[in-house]
Structures are given as structure tokens and as C-alpha cells.
From Swiss-Prot:
It comes from Rattus norvegicus (Rat). InterPro entries: BMP3/BMP3B (IPR017197), Cystine-knot_cytokine (IPR029034), TGF-b_C (IPR001839), TGF-beta-rel (IPR015615), TGFb_CS (IPR017948). This is Growth/differentiation factor 10. Glycans are attached at N114, N152, N277, N467. The gene is Gdf10. GO terms for cellular component: extracellular space. Residues 30-366 form a propeptide. SUPFAM superfamilies: Cystine-knot cytokines. It is found in: Secreted.
């Protein structure tokens, strides 16, 4: 054989062995395989997505100190996603989160969940169990064994065995124990090569538990090995998210039912004229007489100065929210005013909202400059002003707007009058039938508002309330 052909043949035989020679260089046959955790895996891309869930970032900063846990961060991002896209969360209007309480039973961690804060009107759509999967305990990597042969050496890599699979077990706690409760479901999990957050659909488990009235559940991640009983960090505690559709959220006064935390009628403070032993009436009491501000939604005293002591007699002492509009008091001399300022300020004993006279004067001046025809007026609601800021996480305030103005004949098209409102305004203008009021300026189109708040059990809840902000007004 020619020398050139021999060199080409030898080169073609040695070329496949180049990677193996590089592996064995410097350590012979005793070189160890890199650990599993250092090898690239397909889960790395999933890990990058999970990092968004693990790192609080700006979302946690919005929650303030003491609330920067993974559950609150996850819920805040759902809230921000709704505000950004406008799509209902999970296809419904309610998302409830439930934190776990850790206990160690038989040297194994068991997580308890109390789901009793779910309302009967909330129809469950889906439920997910979120947990942090610890990195598996891999067996030690085997060495590389090489068997020399006559012409070339062949080496075989012995990969480590796979770790044991995890079993996620759910039980109801009708017996108040984790090991004797009714088995609700179990699923096998393959631990990922690296620690990351995972989510599993447990809709059937939650729906069955609610149908049976057993909303105290336990979850256990069983690997077959005894745990040392060392609790995991609170940032890695599992939690449950329940996506639901609240069928009662469009009912009247639904926002107060879910967000109000105290009785608007203080204990021991009775309605005028009510019997001492009469039971409290949860309905809103309204005055029999109707004052002019209730007809055109304008602030009282906009057109005329009210009488000093008779202006507030049309209202009960305590409506659901007492009227924030106080009558203007007669002007006092400078000496009397100075003497009044020197008096000691005594805070009001009532929990009902009250605004000072200067605020009302500014509001009236703004309305004097606004058009008299029915239109949308600006109104910003701050939850701190009504005492709800202690449990509402976001938003702190929102633009509610309101409708006010006259619906006089002839009504322009800009006020979008209904046919009935048009006929009513004509009958009033003709004056054949006495006592016919003007059509009312009311909201026509309204927008929803997502509210992130803490329920009575300090669980973070996201609800999308309809008809919270006025978009357009019309005469009706």
C-alpha cells in the first residue's frame, strides 16, 4: 500500500476517537463524569420562566414590608396582568389563594390548607397546587471504565441511576388527622434536575372536597424516605390557587358585602325613632322626603345657600354612609372665629365619614365651573378615606367618576336620552300633569375594577367587580 494511502486510512480510523482522547487527557481512565447538575438540560428554559415566580422584584415592593411572600407576589402579578390585558383571570372573576401550614408527622412534612373561606356563590373553574420541588439526591456518579483491545481502546460511561419518584397525596381532614383522613387524590411526580416551582391541576380534588363539605385538606410530598423534619424556608411553602366565577358579584351592594369589615351602624347608636329593643335592619334606610340634590346629583347648596339648621333634616342620622355634605354655617365675625380656633378639638365619636367645610366649598366652586347639562364628573375614591386600606392591597385609589347635571327639555343628543326620558321631559315641559320630575342623569356605560385584598383569614384574593367606574352618562 502506498504511504499516502496508509496515512489517510490511519487518520480516518483515529478521527472518531478524538472526543474520547480529550476526555481522558490528563487523568487517564480514572476521570469522573461531571455531576448531573452541571450538565445542561431541557429544564433550564423552564427554570428561567420559574425565576419570574421566585424573584419578587417590583411586584413585592408594591406589597410593602411583611407581605413579600411568593403567594402575594403571584397574586399581584395576576392583578397586574388583568389590568394590562383586561382578560378575566382564569375565565372567571375571582382568584383565591390559600397558604399552607406546615406540620411534621412521622418525620415527614405535611401541609395543611383551610379552604373554608370560599363562598357558596363562587363556582370553581380550576384549581392548581403550586410547590417548590427540591433538587433530587442523585447517587454518586460512576467512574469511566476502559477495556483495552488489540487495536484501539473502548471506554463505557456508567451514568448514575434515576432518583426515586415523588408522590403527591391529598387527604381531607374530617378525622382531624393527616394519616386517617379520606384520600382525595394522588399523583406521581418526577423530580426535576434542579429545584424549581411546579404547578399541578387539582381541580377535581377541590371540587369533590367542596361537594362533600370537607374543605380542610392536607398535602404530602412522599418520596419514600424519612425526612429530617427541618422545615423549608417560608418562601418555598406550597400554596393553592382557586379560580372561580362568583355568581353573586353582580348583585346589589356586592362590593360592600365582600370588602366591608365593620358595621356601619355603631353599637349602641340607634336610629332616630327606632324602638330600643328593635332588631337591627341590615337594609339601607332612606328618608321619606327627597331633597333637590337627590334629583340632579349636584352638591347641596350649589344653587342657593341652605338654611343654617334645617338643611340636614331630610337625612337620617346614619344612612349606610352618612351624607358627607354638611350645611354651610353662617359667617362669624373675626373675633368669634379666632375664639373658635382656640377651642380644643374633640374628634367625632361616630365612625361615619365627615368632611370639613373648606373641602365642601372647594367642591362647590369646581361644580360652578362645570357644565349644567348632564355629563360625567370627576371623582377619585381613595380607600383610605373610607377605612378599607388596611386590607385592600391594590389599588390604593381609583377614578370612579359620577354623573350629574340637568336633563331639561329639549335634551341634546349628547346626553343620550332614552325614549322614555324624552317623553317624560316633554310631559314635564307641557305641564299638563303636575309633579313630574326631570329625567335623571345616570351612568350609561361602566367599567369593571379588579381589587386585590386580604380576606378574613388573611388570604390574598383577587376579585373583578363590575360597574365600578363610569365611562359615559345619559338621561334616563
Amino acid at each position: 500500500m502506498a504511504p499516502g494511502l496508509a496515512r489517510i486510512s490511519l487518520r480516518s480510523q483515529l478521527l472518531p476517537l478524538v472526543p474520547l482522547l480529550l476526555l481522558l487527557r490528563g487523568a487517564g481512565c480514572g476521570h469522573r463524569v461531571p455531576s448531573w447538575s452541571s450538565l445542561p438540560s431541557a429544564a433550564d428554559s423552564v427554570q428561567r420562566d420559574r425565576d419570574l415566580q421566585q424573584s419578587p422584584g417590583d411586584a413585592a415592593a408594591a406589597l410593602g414590608p411583611g407581605a413579600q411572600d411568593i403567594v402575594a407576589v403571584h397574586m399581584l402579578r395576576l392583578y397586574e396582568k388583568y389590568n394590562r390585558r383586561g382578560a378575566p383571570p382564569g375565565g372567571g372573576n375571582t382568584v383565591r389563594s390559600f397558604r399552607a401550614r406546615l406540620d411534621v408527622i412521622d418525620q415527614k412534612p405535611v401541609y395543611f390548607f383551610n379552604l373554608t373561606s370560599m363562598q357558596d356563590s363562587e363556582m370553581i373553574l380550576t384549581a392548581t397546587f403550586h410547590f417548590y420541588s427540591e433538587p433530587p439526591r442523585w447517587p454518586r456518579a460512576r467512574e469511566v471504565f476502559c477495556k483495552p483491545r488489540a487495536k484501539n481502546a473502548s471506554c463505557r460511561l456508567l451514568t448514575p441511576g434515576l432518583p426515586a419518584r415523588l408522590h403527591l397525596i391529598f387527604r381531607s381532614l374530617s378525622q382531624n388527622t393527616a394519616t386517617q383522613g379520606l384520600l382525595r387524590g394522588a399523583m406521581a411526580l418526577t423530580p426535576p434536575p434542579r429545584g424549581l416551582w411546579q404547578a399541578k391541576d387539582i381541580s377535581s380534588i377541590i371540587k369533590a372536597a367542596r361537594r362533600d363539605g370537607e374543605l380542610l385538606l392536607s398535602a404530602q410530598l412522599d418520596s419514600g424516605e424519612k425526612d429530617l423534619g427541618v422545615p423549608r424556608p417560608s418562601s418555598h411553602m406550597p400554596y393553592i390557587l382557586v379560580y372561580a366565577n362568583d355568581l353573586a358579584i353582580s348583585e346589589p351592594n356586592s362590593v360592600a358585602v365582600t370588602l366591608q369589615r365593620y358595621d356601619p351602624f355603631p353599637a349602641g347608636d340607634f336610629e332616630p325613632g327606632a324602638a330600643p329593643n328593635s332588631s337591627a335592619d341590615p337594609r339601607v334606610r332612606r328618608a321619606a322626603q327627597v331633597s333637590k340634590p337627590l334629583q340632579d346629583n349636584e352638591l347641596p347648596g350649589l344653587d342657593e345657600r341652605p338654611a343654617p339648621a334645617l338643611h340636614a333634616q331630610h337625612f337620617h342620622k346614619h344612612e349606610f354612609w352618612s351624607s358627607p355634605f354638611r350645611a354651610l354655617k353662617p359667617r362669624t365675625g373675626r373675633k368669634d372665629r379666632k375664639k373658635k380656633d382656640q377651642d380644643t378639638f374633640t374628634p367625632s365619636s361616630s365612625q361615619v365619614l365627615d368632611f370639613d367645610e373648606k373641602t365642601m366649598q372647594k367642591a362647590r366652586r369646581r361644580q360652578w365651573d362645570e357644565p349644567r347639562v348632564c355629563s360625567r364628573r370627576y371623582l377619585k375614591v381613595d380607600f383610605a378615606d373610607i377605612g378599607w386600606n388596611e386590607w385592600i392591597i391594590s389599588p390604593k385609589s381609583f377614578d370612579a367618576y359620577y354623573c350629574a347635571g340637568a336633563c331639561e327639555f329639549p335634551m341634546p343628543k349628547i346626553v343620550r336620552p332614552s325614549n322614555h326620558a324624552t317623553i317624560q321631559s316633554i310631559v314635564r315641559a307641557v305641564g299638563i300633569v303636575p309633579g313630574i320630575p326631570e329625567p335623571c342623569c345616570v351612568p350609561d356605560k361602566m367599567n369593571s375594577l379588579g381589587v386585590l385584598f386580604l380576606d378574613e383569614n388573611r388570604n390574598v384574593v383577587l376579585k373583578v367587580y363590575p360597574n365600578m367606574s363610569v365611562e359615559t352618562c345619559a338621561c334616563r
